[in-house]
Amino acid sequence: CVNDFNNNRFNIILKSRQLGLSTLVAAYSVWQSIFYKEKNILIIATKLAVAQNFIRKVKTYIKSMPNWLLVPTVVANNKQQVEFSNGSQIKAVPTSDDAGRSEALSLLIVDEAAFVRNFDDLWMGLYPTLSTGGRAIILSTPNGVGGQYHELYTKAERKENKFNPIKLLWDVHPERGDDWFEKETKNMSKKQISQELLCDFASSGDTFLTQDTLDKLRILTKSPIEKSGPEMNVWYWEHPLRS
């Protein structure tokens, strides 16, 4: 993931639970702040407790660094923000209508974006704050189809936007195999398995159709043999009989 963060300005991650992504992103934020001047990094979380926990991870990394490596010193810190002597800062806030809107951001991180309240409106307000070259890392487990996060990720997979899609299933963890999966899923519903482990949009939300039904429909669905018309919106599954 770190190479993706460095090589792509916009990254969107669809992930399984408990892979350590939030911890990795916290470490990446510290690296950006220490080795580059005047970095303005904003993390948006689903609630205040999650935002404060992110800053605790940031502070843990800072405390574990040797003094010779921590060249810029910490000049201010509280439960939601850390500021460095080189002008960089890391701030974590809960979701709100005006979160980050008045700032020019170097890096925007949205944690569990599929569960962020009013993420559609929030993203519309935040995107302009990255116009001066800022980067974005949006990460989440799935939460059904139709929301802004789902749209951004699926468009990224189709290369219809600027995001680099990253999909991390449960088995990317080096200590998780089939035995772990079988044990972990014994007391989970199909929806929980789809959401927490399989990164399945369709089965993770409160959808009318089950995944089994969708799979059957996919098998029965046939692609048209020909398309025509000004906008290619006339589809043929069989050619008409000629008299």
Predicted regions and their residues:
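Phosphate/NTP-binding elements of NTP-utilizing enzymes
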Residues: 1-243
